[in-house]
């Protein structure tokens, strides 16, 4: 009986760890999919990393819902961007919710012919995300960009 109980406990722990690993992977993929979609001019992919009622907070601006988030990208057409994302840290809070912090360096230019000459990064900061499990899978429920360094002359 005791060995059965130990086996059940170990099985439960293993299942929980596997579930947590899947959540970490799904949330990390959202961080990367956001950057890739933005950098490759894919407004639908960009908006679809967010939940239907997702929120993006950026330098005092609030974009709520996929249509508003998609429009934000369309309004910046003609720009070439590159997001370098690192140090992705996922904290699983429940089987349906996780928090993510990632570092981001963004360069934006109006030129479209490669290679683009630039004077440096446009933004150096962090994304603070709340990810939620939805009927569509894991999505960003809320993303806030936090400036860490400002660039001067």
Which residue stretches match the model-derived regions?
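Sec-dependent N-terminal signal peptides
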Residues: 4-12
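Short, low-complexity N-terminal intrinsically disordered segments enriched in polar/charged residues
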Residues: 12-44, 48-52
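Transmembrane beta-barrel outer-membrane domains
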Residues: 25, 80-81, 120-122
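Short beta-strand edge/turn micro-motifs at domain boundaries
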Residues: 97-99, 122-153
